């Protein structure tokens, strides 16, 4: 599966 991570 796809994994998305973001920091902001």
From Swiss-Prot:
GO BP annotations listed: neuropeptide signaling pathway
One GO CC term, this protein: extracellular region
The keyword Transport belongs to this UniProt entry's keyword annotation: no
Subcellular location: Secreted
Keyword set, alphabetical order: Amidation, Neuropeptide, Secreted
Positions carrying Glycine amide: 8
Its biological purpose: Mediates visceral muscle contractile activity (myotropic activity).
Family: Belongs to the kinin family.
Name recorded for this polypeptide: Kinin-4
Native species: Periplaneta americana (American cockroach)
Biological classification of the source: Eukaryota, Metazoa, Ecdysozoa, Arthropoda, Hexapoda
């Amino acid at each position: 599966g796809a994994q998305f991570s973001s920091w902001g």
